[in-house]
A protein has these predicted regions:
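Conserved catalytic motifs of ABC-family nucleotide-binding domains
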Residues: 154
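Conserved ABC ATPase signature
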Residues: 92, 133-140
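Catalytic Walker B motif of ABC-type/P-loop ATPase nucleotide-binding domains
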Residues: 158-161
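Conserved ABC transporter NBD signature motif
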Residues: 60-68, 75-76
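ABC ATPase "signature
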Residues: 216-217
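Conserved ABC ATPase "signature" region
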Residues: 100, 104, 111-129
Length: 247
C-alpha cells in the first residue's frame, strides 16, 4: 500500500488572470490528521476542491488515494468523504432522509442501508431528532449530520473544509475528539481551517497565504524554528511573523 494518501506537485489554479493557488507541493501520509491553515481567501477551499475532483487544476500534478486528480476525478469522489464549509445538507429533508440521500450518492448497496443509517445516527447522536427537518436543528447538530453523511460509505480518506466555522467552542472540542477517534481507526483526515489553535490537533500542517505555502511541518517544529528563544510563542505568532516576512 502506498504510504501517501495525497501527493501534489506544483499544483496551480487560475481564474482568468487571478492565481488562487500558486504551485503548491505537499503530501499527506495515511492515517494522519493533516491541517491546511490560512486566513480566509488564502486558497484553502480551492485546493481542497481540486483534490476532491470538484474543480480541475490549471497545471501541476497530483494523486488522491492513488487516483490522478486530472483524469480520475470520478473515482476520487467515490472513495473519499467530503464535508464542505456550507455542510451540503438538504434543509427541507430530515436527518434520516439526508443520510439515505448520501447512501445513494455513494452507491452503497441497498442491503447495507439500514445498518449504515443506524451507524450514522449512533456516531452523530442524532437518533432523537432523525425525523425533524434539518433546517430546524442547531448549527452544531447540522455539523454532526454533515460529518455523518460524509462518512456514510465509510471512506478511509476524509476531507473537511472549515468544518468548525460558525459553531461554539464546546462543539469544536467534541468535533475534534471524534476526528481523533476516526484516525485511530485508520482514517486519514485533511482539514482546512483559519483557526490557528486547531493546529494542535494535527500531526502536520501546511500554512498558506495568497495561494502560496509559507511553511509546512509539525506545528511545534514551525514555532521552534521561528522562535527558538520564545517558548511561549504559538502558531498565531508564527503566522504573523511569516506574513511580515512576505511584506
Amino acid at each position: 500500500m502506498h504510504p501517501e494518501a495525497v501527493s501534489v506537485m506544483d499544483l496551480e489554479k487560475k481564474f482568468g488572470h487571478f492565481t488562487a493557488v500558486d504551485r503548491v507541493s505537499f503530501s499527506v501520509k495515511r492515517g494522519e490528521i493533516f491541517g491546511f491553515l490560512g486566513p480566509n481567501g488564502a486558497g484553502k477551499s480551492t485546493t481542497i476542491r481540486m483534490l476532491c475532483g470538484i474543480i480541475v487544476p490549471s497545471s501541476g500534478s497530483g494523486h488522491v488515494a492513488q487516483f490522478d486528480i486530472f483524469t480520475e476525478a470520478e473515482q476520487i469522489r467515490q472513495v473519499i468523504g467530503y464535508m464542505s464549509q456550507k455542510f451540503s445538507l438538504y434543509q427541507d429533508l430530515t436527518p434520516f432522509e439526508n443520510i439515505r440521500f448520501y447512501l445513494g450518492i455513494y452507491n452503497v448497496p441497498s442491503e447495507q442501508w439500514q445498518d449504515r443509517i443506524e451507524w450514522v445516527l449512533n456516531i452523530t447522536r442524532l437518533h432523537g431528532v432523525k425525523d425533524r427537518l434539518t433546517r430546524d436543528l442547531p448549527p452544531g447538530w447540522r455539523q454532526r449530520l454533515a460529518l455523518g453523511c460524509a462518512l456514510v460509505h465509510q471512506p478511509k480518506l476524509l476531507f473537511l473544509d472549515e468544518p468548525t466555522s460558525g459553531v461554539d467552542p464546546i462543539t469544536r472540542r467534541h468535533f475534534w475528539d471524534f476526528i481523533k477517534q476516526l484516525t485511530a481507526q485508520g482514517v486519514t483526515v485533511f482539514v482546512t481551517t483559519h483557526y490557528m489553535d486547531e493546529a494542535q490537533h494535527c500531526n502536520r500542517v501546511v500554512m498558506i497565504n495568497e495561494g502560496q505555502i509559507v511553511a509546512q511541518g509539525h506545528p511545534t517544529e514551525i514555532i521552534r524554528n521561528l522562535f527558538p528563544d520564545r517558548p511561549e510563542a504559538d502558531l498565531n505568532d508564527a503566522f504573523i511573523k511569516l506574513m511580515s516576512r512576505r511584506g
